[in-house]
Amino acid sequence: MIKYLSIIYFLFSSISFSDTTIVALDQVHHSFGGLGNNRTSTNEIQFPNGSTDYSSITMRVNLECPTGGCDPWDRKAKISVYHIDQWIEIGRYVTPYGVECGWEIDVTDYRSILRGEVILKSFIDTWVQPGWLVSVEFDFVEGQGQYPFTVVRNLWNYDRLVYGDPTIPVDISTIQEYLPNDTEEAYIRITTTGHGQGNTENAAEFSDKRHDILINGEVSHVHNFWRPDCEFNDCSPQNGTWQYDRAGFCPGDKVDAQNLSILDFSLPGNTVEFDYVLEDYFNQCSPNNPSCVNGVTCTSCAYNNTGHTEPFYYIGSQLIIHTTNKHSNADVYLSISEQDTSLSSVDIYLENYVSVYGVSFKLDLSQLEIQGDGNLSFEDGISGRAEESNWTVSINGEGLIVALAQGSGEPIQPGEGILTRIQLNLENISILSGSLKIIDVEASGYFGRQLSFETGEPTTFELLNTNEELIIPTKIMLHNAYPNPFNPYTTISYDMSEDNFVNLTIFDLAGKKIKTLLNESMVAGFRSVRWRGLDEQYQPVSTGVYLCVFQAGNFRETKKIILLK
C-alpha cells in the first residue's frame, strides 16, 4: 500500500503550477459624451486552462483619471463574465467622487468560469465625458484550494428593481435549484445596493431596510446590507458626501458580497426553493402616487436628475456550490456513461439543476469505424430516469434521440443519474471501434423555456468484435487496468475461455463496495469493461487506491487501480 501511495505523491508533486497574473483591461477609457457611449468595455481574455490548480484568485481593479479629470460623481460599476449564454457578475464597486482609487476582490468562488477563453465585461454607469481609465488584473496563486470544484448558478439579478411603487409591482421570481449529492458547502452569494434619494425615508440609497431570504418557504436569513462605515473608507479624502452611510455601498469602495449558508436548511441531493422578499415600503413621494402634494407630502413629487430620483435596488446573486468532484454550471448536463462493450448498449447520463420537460440530442457516429456486412442501428431507450417519469425515448437511424413526456408523463425533476439506455443492434457487424459523442442538444423547461446545456467527453469503443469466428482464449484471466493510474476512466480487460457467470466489482481499501461493473452470464471471448470512477449512484469517487475484484465460476483475482484527480 505504501508503494502505491508513493506513486500518487510522486505524480502530484511532479506537476508544477506557478503564480500567474492576467491583465484583462489596461487603462480602458469608460466615458459618455462626445467620444460616444463607452460606459461598457467587453474583451476576450485568455485565462489559465486549469484554474482548479490555484488556491486563490484575486481580481484587482484600479481607476485612474483621464485627461480632463475623473468623473466628479459616484457611479455604480461591475465586472461580469459571459458563461453558458448568460452574464455572471463577479465583482461590484462604486466609483469615488473625482479621485483615483483601487481595490482587490476575492473571486476564487468563480474559478469554474475563470478558465480558458472568457468574455469579460466592465461597466461604469457614468454619464459624463471625463469618465475613468479602468485597469483590471487577475492574480492566480498556485496551490490546492479548500474547494477545488465549484458550481456557479445565477439566482436573482436585477439592474433596476423599483422599490415602493405599487404601479410597478416588485416581481422577484421563486427559484428552484438542485444540490448535487457530493456537495460539501453551499451558499447564496448576494450583492444588493440601494439607489435613489429624496423619497420617503430617503430611499433607497439612504434608507436602512432589511429583506428576507426564504429557503423552502421559511425565513432563513434577514438580509442586512447597510454600510455603517463609509466615513472610514480607505479611498479618502474625496469630494462630495462620501462619509454618509448608505444601503450596501460606500462611494470609492468595493461592494462586498455576502455569503448566506444553505446547508443548515437543506441537504445535498435535494431540490431547494429560494425566495427574496423585500421589506414593506411605500414611497409617498412618487409621481405615481395620486395623493402626493408638492411641498406638503414631499419637497417635490416629480423625479429629477438632482435631489429626487426613483428608488431602486441593484441586485446580483448566485448559488455557489462547492463539491468533491467536478460538475457542470449548465441547467442540463448530458454524457455517455461508463461503457461496457460486452453489453452492446449506451447509457446516457443526465444531471439537471432544474426540471426538464423535453430533450433531444444526437449521437455523433462520424468517428466510428464499422466493419462487416451489417449496418449499425439502435433501439428506443429503456429504463432510467426517463422511464421512471413515464417518458418515451425514441431514436432514429441517424442517432437522433428525442425524449418527451407523453400522456401522464411528468417532467424529469432536478437530480442526477442515468437518463436512459440505448441498445445497439450489431447483427453482421464484425468490428466497431472509435469514439461516440453527444451533439446538437436541445433542452426545454417549463412552458418551453430553453435550457442551457453542456455535454461530456466522447466515449471510446476500444474494440467491439461480434464475429462468430473469434479466437477463444485458452484460460480465464484478468489483465491489469489501462491506463493505471487513470483519470477520467480506465479499461479493465479480461479473458473468458468458456461461457460463465461473471462478477466484476470495485472496492475501496476498507472493503466497501464502490461499483458493480458486471454481474451476469458472459460468453467466451476477449472482453473489457470501462470504469469512469463513479459509484453505484453514478457519483464521482475521490482520489485513491481501489481494488478490482473479478470472479468467473471458481476463478477469482484482484487487481489494484489508482484514480488521480
Per-range role (PLM):
Residues 7-18:
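Hydrophobic h-region of N-terminal signal peptides that target proteins for export
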Residues 173-175, 418-422, 525-529:
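Short strand-edge motifs at loop-to-beta-strand transitions and within beta-strands
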Residues 78-80, 212-214, 360-362, 503-507:
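Beta-strand signatures of extracellular beta-sandwich domains
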Residues 183, 192-194, 206, 353-356, ...:
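Short proline/glycine-enriched turn/loop motifs at strand-loop junctions of beta-rich domains
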Residues 327-470:
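Acidic, low-complexity intrinsically disordered segments
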Residues 516, 521-524, 529-530, 539-565:
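C-terminal tail/sorting-segment detector
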Residues 342-351, 355, 465-482, 486-507, ...:
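Glycine-centered coil/turn sites that cap beta-strands in beta-rich domains
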Residues 19-328:
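Extracellular/secretory-pathway and virion-surface proteins
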